[in-house]
Amino acid sequence: MKKWLIIAVSLAIAIVLFMYTKGEAKAAGMTVGYTTGDTASYNSLTKYHTYMNAIATDTFAFEKNGQIIGDAPTKQLTYAKKKKIKTWAVISNYNDAIYDFDGDLASRVMSNKTAKKRFTDQLITLAKKHSYYGINIDFEAVNPEDRAAYSNFIQYVSQALNKKHIKTMVSVPAKSADDKNDDWSWPYDYAKIGKYADFVQVMTYDEHGIWGEPGSVASTNWIKSSLQFSVKKIKANKVIMGIPAYGYDWDVKDGSTSTIREWNELKSLIKKQKAKPAFNKKSGSMTFSYVDKKKHKHVVWYENEKTVQTKSHLAKQYKIAGVSVYALGNESESFWKAIRKGTK
């Protein structure tokens, strides 16, 4: 009787634990939420933390001498640690002076031994001080002639961080081939970067943007082509794809008023303009148009719950490490539920 009692009690405990786990389900695979230091990002983290297992705090940059600048969002880091969510510090070459990513700034730090060492040493200090799990290097608009220099830089930094048990993730623009004529993506040698980085975050968003003609922010076939190229050059278990939590609104007549539209903003815009969204089969994305008070026609491209779920599932299809979301702050739970369904 005692044996059967023990079995019965064990079974009951197992059922309770299963139900608890089901209610507090965590993200499957790697799900990274990019955050800033603002209140909206923090609120999203506290609301939707069960849908992610890592955050990347996009609050750091650097100067031409390699000096790291920026502040650690302590509230977010404290909360993430409490919830056992891994944290990454994003270091970008964004330059406030020019309101853009600065290829020359990146080149300076990559080519100058003193600046490179200072940059790397300070990354280690930063990670140790704030208990970051890893460093996410996000150098964008790297100069085309710096392709080899950037690969060598990633090798140098990754090896230095590895010695201190700090992980390295590198963000790269999405591409389906190495094209010397593509100044934006050519500088990133996937194979060499993937050899030394622990993870490579492929930015599978911004296929189109307000800097160009209207179109899908992340069409299905474009993502597929990018992931196919990525896993040929990089081990699949190192690759992370990107999911946009935003869309773009193009003013067809006056491009200067074109703007980004956050996830939560889109539904209210549709309601306000009495727009009729349509699914674009070719891109696998949503689109609609409207006319504003100035009689200007606008074209909007975005993702909804269904398309987010479909595109998130590509992470499973290509057996990659996971997904990343850019960015926390103005998304809803329905967005996160779509990612969870897609990555299951």
Swiss-Prot record:
The active site is at 140 (proton donor). It holds the Pfam family Glyco_hydro_18. Residues 29-344 form the GH18 domain. The keyword Cell cycle does not apply. InterPro entries: CFLE_GH18 (IPR041704), Chitinase_II/V-like_cat (IPR011583), Chitinase_insertion_sf (IPR029070), Glyco_hydro18_cat (IPR001223), Glycoside_hydrolase_SF (IPR017853). It comes from the Bacteria. Its EC number is 3.2.-.-. One of its GO terms (biological process) is carbohydrate metabolic process. One of its GO terms (molecular function) is hydrolase activity, acting on glycosyl bonds. Keywords: Glycosidase, Hydrolase, Signal. Residues 1-27 form the signal peptide. Belongs to the glycosyl hydrolase 18 family. PANTHER family: CHITINASE DOMAIN-CONTAINING PROTEIN 1 (PTHR46066:SF2), CHITINASE DOMAIN-CONTAINING PROTEIN 1 FAMILY MEMBER (PTHR46066). This is Uncharacterized glycosylase YvbX.
